[in-house]
Amino acid sequence: MKYTCLILLWSLFATMALPADNLIQSISIVPCPESITPGTGYFTFSGKTDFTVENEEQAEVARCFSALFTQAAGFTPCVKVGEKKGKISFLTDDALKSEAYHLEITPRQIIVKASDTKGFFYALQTIRQLLPASIEGTAVVETADWSVPAMTIKDEPRFGYRGLMVDVARFFIPKENLLRIIDCMGMLKINTLHLHLVDDNGWRIEIKRYPLLTEIGSRRVDRPGKSFPERRNPRQGEPTVEKGFYTQEDIREIVAYATRHQVEVIPEIEMPAHSNAALASYPLLACPVVDKFIGVLPGLGGNHADVIFCAGNDSVFTFLQGVIDEVVELFPSRYIHLGGDEARKTHWKECPLCQERMRQEGLEDEEALQGYFMARMSKYVQSKGKEAMGWDELTNTRIPDGAIIYGWRGYGQAAVKAAEQGHRFVMTPARIMYLIRYQGPQWFEPLTYFGNNTLKDVYRYEPIQKEWSPEVRSLLMGVQASMWTEFCNKPEDVEYQLFPRLAALAEVAWTQPWHKNWRSFLVAMDKFNEHLSAKGIVFACSMYNIQHTVTPVNGKLQVKLECERPDVEIRYTMDGKEPTDRSLLYKSPLMVTGTQTIKCTTYRAGRQMGKTLTLPLVWNKATAKPVLGNTQAGKILVNGIRGSLRQSDFEWHSWESSDSVAFTIDLQKKESLRSVSVGCITNYGMAAHKPADIEVWVSNDNRDYRKVSGKQFTDGEIFREGTFKEDVVLDLNKEIGRYVRIIAKGAGECPATHVRPGQEARIYFDEVMIE
């Protein structure tokens, strides 16, 4: 069936060449091309379609594309080298930049021009997205119309580095699933796969010289039912289970497949930290002062993550050089990533070998010792004809000569610091490009940690900042999304976190900012999601869900409902019934008094698109009353909404244990007070715990206060394991007062037996309820 919604648009624009951002809904390509000139009619693929190409490299690109038709259409367009007059012709144009392409589609033929195989490949990926989504299937679709609209496209990338980092160490991604991700990367013109192969939680690559790395390092203890931060460290002798690794033959297959899809695979071998899997396999490579059992960590590890490679032991460098020797033979990439992040120097400070190394090398502190470590390994990588890369902690001391820095902390500012010293850099800021973060309203999302990086957050990211000098701008290689996998338990979990945000990253990396358009992107992304669905790829629909904000305003509650999608309606009810497409249409914030339950969801063309959000607004004497001296707390603690089990869901107010926790609620008149309830959350793995003690003070005039109730808790009551909510209820015995002051004291540092020993616990309150 022809795309009827396109036909009118093609006829309207048939004689006009317009920038891509003006052709809203006329095509469906992610990332958005540089320019498009619509034509008239359609080119139809059939068993008579043939490719004529100039050489074998082009032929390989054409065959990769033709294979899609073999499975989905039952015919295979033939590929001919050196012949003329094919339906689809490849022509080399040396005037085009690398990866750029010109694509001319008419009803009779398709002409593809590029200067390299990458450009030819990307031109065909553009055609692939224009085809029906059933092109991705494995069964022949007899009724499909394999037509694409006539047009001329001129396209080239904004950045040369368009990357995705996938962490296969914390959760091992089977080879077959990784290949599916690579295929999707090719469709999106993402050209770099940064493969995080090793960490505290697993060693995932076979090194023949050191077989224990996979015999021991790929295994770990199971902690069923526990999220990553909650998992306790392994005990010596505790049984382990195989979590997986790639053989060297697997790696060769992955690299070859990626090469066919124009994806460069960069291996990362972490050092000196994130090395428990390696040190569990070869414990003599740790500092001799380490007196604890070294095992592959199932979770964060607490102070066991302090165990890192010994910088004073030459055997460590011999070992790592041996690993690098095999890695360079497996990966043809120009680059090897050496990690370098989050190295705690606890044992280095106590280690006689490390201290002796510092004296020998004239190093002033342990940070400089890491600089020595990374510089030494960087030079070895360079001796193998490769370039070294590392995380932005390399800027904490002298950066290794020639090292490429990945900016990840915060908004990646440290990488700019490296650029000011002449180093190339890649931006992958955690606050925007870490796909482990929630991609939509958290009440609907699988548990992870930290805050939100929504589809729109990723899409609107602009890596080049106005204040950057021309020199800094010239050193930016590109951008990368980073997929950390500690909360993933199956390959589908990884896919869910990746898609569709990876499509947004693709447009950031490929498309010039002036061609980007949020509404146009959503239309194209919807079509791309159809391709994902046909491939059996799991993707999130979080952008259809509703984010709520409930704020006290003049004694009422203002309920604001928002959706990232501008093309949907929000329908809601206030009578407890499920919303339909005929329910009340949300147009502006709702003002609520008294207990209410609001239910709402999104609709488009009569079809429900998002999940139903239920907001039970619970009213009590504190609801919508002023909270004195703490504006932010006043927006949360008396807004009638209880928090979820995700303490970052914007319904929890938090304090460090060392903070002074004190706030006052003005009831605006004297009241008889029976009780105060304070909602708390325990998230053991994130060191979120209720306070050590809590007190209630009451006043009639906001000057003279009297203590009317209080509770204290033992360490056993505070530092309970699990993730759960509870209300701390304090009896006020019908005390009379207008002002109610809550004072709480934190529990301080988590005890030595905690999964986060020594870390300061945080207090989280969601609601104060006064009866």
Task: Outline where the language-model segments fall.
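Surface-exposed loop/turn motifs at beta-strand-loop junctions within extracellular Ig-like
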Residues: 116, 602-606, 746-748
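Short, compositionally stereotyped local motifs that mark structural "simplifiers"
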Residues: 19-20, 40, 52-53, 512, ...
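Bacterial Sec-dependent N-terminal signal peptides
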Residues: 1-25
